[in-house]
Amino acid sequence: MTTTSGQAPVRRLRRTERREQILDAATHAFARSGYAATSLDDVAREASLTRALLYRHFDSKADLYRAVLDRACQRLVETVGEDDFDETSIPSLLRAAAADPDAFRLLFHHTAREPEFRELIDSITTASAEIARRNLAKRVPAGPWLEWASQLIPTLTIEAVIAWLDSGQPDPDQAAARVDQVVKGVIAAAQPASGSG
């Protein structure tokens, strides 16, 4: 169907579709320049919308950024889970990162640098360390090395995934096994030294 001007009519998106379009555009814009350097005009341009239309969905840039981060967290939990670590966790984390690299980088790279949103990444870091501690307690004796490994493994895993993304996602079939080798290296390093009591 065409209009009298010969152009196809513009299909109006439902509110939920429009919101997703805005969140997708905002994710790309914020990942490209960071929160502080990205304006709502940048997001509107990325989404091919007016700034006024953005304000129909979000009250402010901070509100939009929070919605982007919340959606990234929700998708991550849907893919990876939130309460356990098992043999599917690293492959799931890589799948989540590959599915939306910009959202993954925003969540774990940019957000840590944004004081206004720092509490979100801090809560993820705390929860990840607790999950690691629970799982490592089966293999590493209680004490400072358990605490060290509990903090290091989630951080190292996330940084390994970001480095994998930044390297062009090489060898996706073996990436999880490679990250797992790094995790196992930390676990081995956290074990008591031979001959120590």
Can you annotate each of these PLM segments?
Residues 80-83, 107-111, 164-168:
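Secondary-structure edge/capping motif, primarily at the C-terminal ends of alpha-helices
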Residues 85-108, 117-119, 123-133, 154:
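Helical hydrophobic small-molecule/effector-binding pocket
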Residues 115-140, 144-155, 174-177, 181-188:
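Amphipathic alpha-helical packing segments from all-alpha helical-bundle domains
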